[in-house]
């Protein structure tokens, strides 16, 4: 949906008394990449936050690959945007992240988290983690534990690896 279409829909809801808007997607930060308008998710959030009214904006889920300083700065700038971020890291091991085809590494993830916490000291940070990924070593598992301990998440959703139908890893036998 275009920025104008999204903004009009949300404006109608707010004028109707809605107090909380949640933008939901597998990777909300990729908003606009398929549009020719030159706008991204941070621009959409800013446009919504400028709509008159008393409401709160939430969103999930963000992909670390597309989470940008611009997004975090936008969140920090507008009081109507909840200082809450679900940013799945999946593994603390760069090798495992590469095997998962996640398109970021441990250091990049930590840089993004540190920046987000710097510009939003009251940030509520949640994440997802998968353990038992095929080929994950004990040392790589420990890298995941150390990342968890260093970030201090407010909430963490933990999963044991399970192959998903239609994916390359669905062909393996565990």
Question: What do the PLM-derived regions correspond to, one by one?
Answer:
Residues 1-5, 9-10, 172-173:
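Single conserved hydrophobic/aromatic residue that forms the stacking wall/gate
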Residues 15-138, 149:
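Conserved SAM/AdoMet-binding glycine-rich loop
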């Amino acid at each position: 949906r275009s920025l104008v279409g999204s903004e009009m829909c949300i404006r109608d809801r707010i004028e109707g008394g809605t107090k909380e808007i949640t933008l939901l997607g597998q990777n909300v930060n990729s908003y606009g990449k398929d549009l020719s308008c030159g706008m991204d998710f941070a621009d959409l959030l800013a446009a919504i936050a400028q709509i008159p009214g008393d409401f709160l904006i939430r969103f999930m889920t963000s992909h670390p690959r597309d989470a940008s300083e611009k997004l975090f700065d936008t969140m920090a700038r507008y009081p109507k945007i909840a200082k809450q971020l679900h940013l799945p890291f999946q593994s603390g091991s760069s090798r495992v992240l590469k095997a998962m085809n996640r398109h970021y590494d441990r250091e990049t993830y930590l840089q993004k988290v540190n920046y987000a916490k710097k510009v939003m000291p009251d940030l509520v940070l949640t994440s997802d983690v998968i353990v038992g990924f095929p080929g994950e070593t004990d040392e790589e598992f420990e890298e995941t534990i150390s990342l968890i301990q260093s970030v201090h998440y407010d909430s963490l959703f933990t999963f044991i690896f399970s192959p998903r139908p239609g994916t390359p890893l669905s062909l393996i036998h565990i």
